[in-house]
Amino acid sequence: MKKIAWFILFLVFLMMYSHAVKHVLEGGQRLGVLTKPIKEFALFVTTATEAYSQIKKDHSDDQESGLTAYTKINALDKDLFVLNPTYRKDLNTWRISLYNVKEGTEDLFWDVDESDWIDTEIVPRRRVLRHPILLSDSSIVFIGENTHVIYRVSKSGELMWKARGCRFHHALNPEEEGALWVCTKKESFVKQYEKWGITYEDSGIAKLDISNGEILYEESVSQILFKNNLSGLVLGARNGEQASGHDPLHLNDVQVVVNNSEWMEKGDLFLSLRNRSTIIHFRPSNGKVINVIQGDFIQQHDVDYLNDSLISIFNNNKSGIGPENFFRKNFDDLESNYSLMTSNVHVYDLKNNRFYQPLDSVLSTVGFFTHDQGLHEYLPGVGWALESQNHSQLVIINEDSVIHNGFLALDSDGRKVDMNWSRFYTNLDFLNN
């Protein structure tokens, strides 16, 4: 009888624990101080699996020179400079390098150790630097992704300023009037019924003074959507919670408009919301959402302003259904066979509300795919440049020809240099020295 009693108690405990796990993973807060430990314990296996996968990836990176990753092509007939941050295992530090892709040379570099400027317990390999900008005085501005700090560093490597106060991440884009636009994030709370609510990771945007890092403007993307009667984009779609928590929007780029036209105004912003496969055309001057842009692109990174009526979108083309490693899948057993095999570029014409994909026929032959991160840029006189972060692959397409396909460089140990939110320059005429 005792065994039966213990068994029944065990079943009751399992039922109560299962209900508690379901409650906290759906955003419930009724368990008070127990909410966070129950959630962390429930997600332990997922977190441990992700950590193990990263360790395996790091180990495999150590063994891979990159020489056989893909057929290398370099038919550039003009200079192209790429400013790229990468963790150099041979140097045991993060290095931001300016490469001349045509010549295959490293022309400038900055070795960066964030612990020289801030207190952090994050080991160097995990700090992650992103999206550097080269300025006219040969200083650089860049994001410390996992420390959520923006730095400006002189040509000689001295810290000029650091910006804190927001959790900065992903993209950093300049405005003509000496300002920078950047993605931010914070935890937000939505009250639901009287006794409980939902906490989630909210995306935001911030504008910084490039001369000193002062925050000039800050706004929550959720609040932008709520105020424009678009709450469904925040709360309406039910996807599985990620290990990091509820992240309904996942802003990964903010792109500023530089000219007035019939379809946009100077100072307008295009916001890329990865987890909604949506681009938001937002006007900070009056707080209005001008357009919600959706189409045949999935979990995109990077939206670019092309001209007075065109924008371009880097489409990762990764399914948002299923586990995080669910990509490059064909549903051969279904009547509708939708292929997720190639990342590409979508150009959207605001004038006639149409999309077209200018690079599909070429990219399908290259085998270009990155299931996360990645970016692109149209470079007049050169062509389209595309970065696959997962494969450290730089593809450049001019008309219907691939004029570059390969990695940027090899380090001193023969490993390919990773690409990590690079920036492209067709010339360096803007430098004062």
What residue spans do the PLM features occupy?
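Cytosolic-side transmembrane helix boundary signature
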Residues: 1-2
